[in-house]
């Protein structure tokens, strides 16, 4: 099964030529180039590939958050896509997006263990953006839950909390994250 990544949420139709307002969920708008293959589906369709319908990008105006797809030329056709998600395959995203040193794809961070002072606090199950700050949603290790700590807690993606991300070791080392867990 192809892994799909949410690029944005499609808003209302704009204009008479099938334009779509795009609420970007990605840090890489440069991936939205003419000719790039994308898919549209309900936002909860991550695991139901039959829900995805393929399209090709005609253009994207980042300053206006305006997306045009090659086969959508009327407001009526555009309205059919309102409130759906715009997705791109993980492979296509990684091919088109050039990461700087220290940057990561969300999909590579989900599933990593969170470790502080050689103690596993849990694993990253999701990443959320709240007020321009990314947060790791961490499912707490069972042994810590049994001690009465929260089942889920959030760690801001800030240097104060995140010491190092080691993809090869499948772990994120932290400072001060256990305090967040204890106070959750």
UniProtKB/Swiss-Prot annotation:
Q: Does the keyword Phosphoprotein apply?
A: no
> Looking at the Swiss-Prot or TrEMBL record, what is one Pfam family this protein matches?
RimM
Q: Does the keyword Transmembrane apply?
A: no
The UniProt entry, under Gene3D superfamilies, shows: PRC-barrel domain, RimM
GO molecular function per UniProt: ribosome binding
Keywords (alphabetical) are: Chaperone, Cytoplasm, Ribosome biogenesis, rRNA processing
Tell me the ranges covered by the PRC barrel domain, including all copies: 101-180
Q: Name one GO biological process term.
A: ribosomal small subunit biogenesis
Q: Name where it mostly resides.
A: cytoplasm
Cellular localization per UniProt: Cytoplasm
Q: Which SUPFAM superfamilies match?
A: PRC-barrel domain, Translation proteins
Q: Which GO terms describe its cellular component?
A: cytoplasm; ribosome
Domain comment? The PRC barrel domain binds ribosomal protein uS19.
| Subunit structure as annotated in this protein's UniProt entry | Binds ribosomal protein uS19.
Function text: An accessory protein needed during the final step in the assembly of 30S ribosomal subunit, possibly for assembly of the head region. Essential for efficient processing of 16S rRNA. May be needed both before and after RbfA during the maturation of 16S rRNA. It has affinity for free ribosomal 30S subunits but not for 70S ribosomes.
**Which PANTHER family does the record cross-reference, listed alphabetically?**
RIBOSOME MATURATION FACTOR RIMM
Q: Which family does it belong to?
A: Belongs to the RimM family.
Q: What is this protein called?
A: Ribosome maturation factor RimM
